[in-house]
Structure formats: C-alpha cells, structure tokens
From Swiss-Prot:
Subcellular location: Cell membrane; Endosome membrane
Consequence the record notes for mutating residue 40 to V: Constitutively GTP-bound and constitutively active
SUPFAM superfamilies, per database record: P-loop containing nucleoside triphosphate hydrolases
Cofactor: Mg(2+)
Compositionally biased residues, Pro residues: 10-20
Highest classification ranks of the organism: Eukaryota, Metazoa, Chordata, Craniata, Vertebrata
Official protein name in the record: Rho-related GTP-binding protein RhoV
One GO-annotated biological process of the protein: small GTPase-mediated signal transduction
Tissue: Highly expressed in brain and testis and at lower levels in spleen and lung.
Entry keywords, A to Z: Cell membrane, Endosome, GTP-binding, Lipoprotein, Magnesium, Membrane, Metal-binding, Nucleotide-binding, Palmitate, Phosphoprotein
Ranges for region Disordered: 1-28
GO molecular function: GTP binding; GTPase activity; metal ion binding; protein kinase binding
UniProt: GTP binding residues: 38-45, 85-89, 143-146
Length: 236
C-alpha cells in the first residue's frame, strides 16, 4: 500500500474580531469662579485652606491675592471651582477689584466676633461687589463661629468696650436685606458647616450660570444633598 501523503492541516478559521468597546467621552468640565471678600483677619484664607487641603494655618498672614483650584463631582459631572482669596486691606482695593468681573459667586465674609467686620458688609463690601459685578449671587458667611462662646474672646470684647458677638438673627436679617442667597455660619478650625458653605456656593453658581445661558429647566438643579460629591485635587 503506498504511503499516505500528509498534508498540512489548515488552521482553524479565526473568530471574527470584535472592536473594543468605545469609551464614553468624559463630560466637559464646568468651571466656577468663587471670590471671597471681607475685612482682613476674618478668616477667609483659613476657610479656603481648611476646605481644600484639610489643614489650618498656624498664624495669620495678610493676603494680597491667592487662588486655589479644586475639582469636584456634581451629579457625576466634573466641576472645577477656582477660589480667589482677596485682601481686605485698603492698600489692595485696586488690585482686588480686578478679579471681580466674570465671578460666578461671591462669599461676603465677616467674623461673628468682630462686629465692625459685619458692619462693613453693607458699608464697603456689597457696594464694591455690585459696582463691578451687579448680577453674581452673594452668600453671607459668618466665620470663626467656634469663638462665639469662647470665654477669652468674650472678655476681650467686654474689656475693649466693644459689642458682643453678632447675633445670628441679625445676620439672617442682613442676608434677607441684601438679597443674599443665604446666611451660613462656619468654623475653619472645627470645619463645622464648612462643606455646607462651599456646597451652597457651587450650587448657587451653577444655577446662576444656567440662568444666564437660559438652560435652566423647570426642575432646576438637584440639591447637593442628593448628589455624589467628591473632592479630587487641591492646586495652590
């Protein structure tokens, strides 16, 4: 019997290649500019540092102009908030006003244990804001709330012949008078209500931008209490 001829086995047919799944393009990042104003030494820098970097400045250093950037998620969409820390001293009035245009939201800050800083909200800060930016929302923020019941602070106020801490109802009344979005008290040291301040600022800015772009639907923006909220980066 003649030997059988061996033939090379044909390779099995390759399975049809399937294209890799397409990655969903990331939603565009929304940018928000938030400017903090108020008298010197009321704790504006401390608010920003405590919120963005989870730290607390060990000593007071007057600010000329600093910016911080944080990325967060709101309803799954990336939002980058730029926090502008301004100087409260008169020497920086001209420099400070340069950052007011294109601001999406202002935090008008006063210390609850410095009545003069509260008085300056209506005498200086609100007029200055509205001169350069008449439409952006304003939040009234009472800082250093942890000192409201501090015995040493109360003694110093009494010995100096100054008024006591600013009553919360009085601050609430001012917020209504100046048509601020809300009034919030917070502490950079203990971080009490700190997140709520910036949550409210971001929400107010988003709604303001939506109104300007005429894209705010009937339901509006969901409250941040229902949103997934994550902080990613801090750039100083």
């Amino acid at each position: 019997m003649p030997p059988r001829e061996l033939s090379e086995a044909e390779p099995p047919p390759l399975p049809a290649s399937t294209p890799p799944p397409r990655r969903r393009s990331a939603p565009p990042e929304l940018g928000i500019k938030c400017v903090l104003v108020g008298d010197g030494a009321v704790g504006k820098s401390s608010l920003i540092v405590s919120y963005t970097c989870n730290g607390y400045p060990s000593r007071y250093r007057p600010t000329a102009l600093d910016t911080f950037s944080v990325q967060v998620l709101v309803d799954g969409a990336p939002v980058r908030i730029e926090l502008w820390d301004t100087a409260g001293q008169e020497d920086f009035d001209r420099l400070r006003s340069l950052c007011y245009p294109d601001t999406d939201v202002f935090l008008a800050c006063f210390s609850v244990v410095q009545p003069s800083s509260f008085q300056n909200i209506t005498e200086k800060w609100l007029p200055e804001i509205r001169t350069h930016n008449p439409q952006a929302p304003v939040l009234l923020v009472g800082t250093q709330a942890d000192l409201r019941d501090d015995v040493n602070v109360l003694i110093q106020l009494d010995q100096g012949g100054r008024e006591g801490p600013v009553p919360e109802p009085q601050a609430q009344g001012l917020a209504e008078k100046i048509r601020a979005c809300c009034y919030l008290e917070c502490s950079a040291l203990t971080q009490k209500n700190l997140k709520e301040v910036f949550d409210s600022a971001i929400l107010s800015a988003i709604e303001h931008k939506a109104r300007l772009e005429k894209k705010l639907n009937a339901k509006g923006v969901r409250t941040l209490s229902r949103c997934r909220w994550k902080k990613f980066f801090c750039f100083v």
